[in-house]
């Protein structure tokens, strides 16, 4: 990569507090050849700004991995604001809903894959892949989706189309090439991933765009002009000398490779049928034969089929057990990886491979999929480690994995604002609701915000309803809310649309909310994952960006985890107090700009009520004469279906899906 300064950090702020020494140590360690480091940064010390400075010093492509979509979105917004002239991309799962293919042997129930793709997030994924191949100044903020298989990097590169003015290119040849790149010709519904032909003009909407199209103007067999144009009104925006057009699918492949892949699938099918027949599993042999032959016919005819990802090993011509191609391959050999909230993200990465292994094994054993489907998987942890180059584990509470590696730990405890860690109060659970209400009213008088964390979803729902009845502007942040909607809710909290946010496990790591002056932890003394020392330290830290920040633990005793969390908080607080006294500085309020959320507008309401209940058998559907009532019922069932899929209750999810389809047949959902 060029040594010129590609990354240009733009900010009115200068490193302060503990940031200068942390930046210097981290950069020097990398220059000395160290590959891994820990940045132990207390909440609110500006770890993201420190990382931005590291990126500017190292001048390398950077992958930032967050453990949930909310944090990924927040990091994306912050880094995009700091690097306005560089490419900052967003790569998360594009599924709004995903129910995997499954077979439940106990009831002999096969459940087809069912999913809903968010087109706008898919667009952002394509933009990330294209930027990594086209530029050196790229930062990608990703969820663990980055360790899941995408198309082969070499195939994607070979499928890239370069066009420039003056090129000799027959119009029909370009049409054929676009179809090979998975673009669909559509003269009526012109949208992302399609093209249309108007005389000597071909218009394309690339996979990484939506509002800006590409217009190729021919004069005979020569490209006379290339333009960007506004898809809405058709007006030309700029004339271009050349363009690079990436495939409409990340799973692009060429015809020759596809044919070789089909041969390999046929050979494996033959071997699997022989296996089933030898073991007297004739029904399984018949099922795998019918399914695979149908898929092969579709692959031969149109180059695609339902569940094509299950044949990815063959279509990429990989060997059994070989690591899948992922977004990480698009970074090349020299790049920086930031693992945000590493104490949560590392265990998440470790667990991805095992998550659905048994589900796929069932599909293979009972004749629904070929054994090669097992290679349609995320990276194993050792494969992920092998792909890393320079790594910073970023956390206020590093996990055991990082701490046992015996790598440098760089501490960042002093905040640029010189604000101290919150004071902690322990209060009894008796009359805790009345006490909490009093605290909320006190904080809202001072235009401050409140976070409340509970142990269960039911308790969060009940508490939200209770506070609403008391006229508190409260929102409930729960797992069913879509990733981009969560960012809107957090933004609305900062803007004052809500005074209070209630949640279970979504109010811990990384939420940057300087307006929050109070964190209330209910059932703080209960033992378990949600109340271990790391969780408590992280939760307390949500109030660490506010001068008057404090945490209230409602508990009837002090658990060992509480004791550790309290001691660590006060250890940091003491260091901060001593620094402030020595340097004669005074804590100041943080006036943090409220950034726009990711450039995708949510049409749905930011708050949805949770629906609970079980589906018992084939429940008879009520007739809905009112369209609004019918739509509400469908949405209610969709929520229940998603929840069932999340808990791997595939039978319940399939039953709900059938009920939804039956309702939709009686009238289109608006």
Curated annotation (Swiss-Prot):
GO terms for molecular function: ATP binding; ATP hydrolysis activity; DNA binding; excinuclease ABC activity. ATP binds at residues 41-48. The keyword Transmembrane helix does not apply. Residues 28-414 form the Helicase ATP-binding domain. SMART domains: DEXDc, HELICc. Gene3D superfamilies: P-loop containing nucleotide triphosphate hydrolases, UVR domain. Pfam families: Helicase_C, ResIII, UVR, UvrB, UvrB_inter. A motif (Beta-hairpin) lies at residues 94-117. SUPFAM superfamilies: C-terminal UvrC-binding domain of UvrB (SSF46600), P-loop containing nucleoside triphosphate hydrolases (SSF52540). Residues 631-666 form the UVR domain. One of its GO terms (biological process) is SOS response. Keywords: ATP-binding, Cytoplasm, DNA damage, DNA excision, DNA repair, Excision nuclease, Nucleotide-binding, SOS response. Belongs to the UvrB family. Forms a heterotetramer with UvrA during the search for lesions. Interacts with UvrC in an incision complex. The beta-hairpin motif is involved in DNA binding. The UvrABC repair system catalyzes the recognition and processing of DNA lesions. A damage recognition complex composed of 2 UvrA and 2 UvrB subunits scans DNA for abnormalities. Upon binding of the UvrA(2)B(2) complex to a putative damaged site, the DNA wraps around one UvrB monomer. DNA wrap is dependent on ATP binding by UvrB and probably causes local melting of the DNA helix, facilitating insertion of UvrB beta-hairpin between the DNA strands. Then UvrB probes one DNA strand for the presence of a lesion. This is UvrABC system protein B. It comes from Onion yellows phytoplasma (strain OY-M). The lineage of its organism: Bacteria, Bacillati, Mycoplasmatota, Mollicutes, Acholeplasmatales. The gene is uvrB.
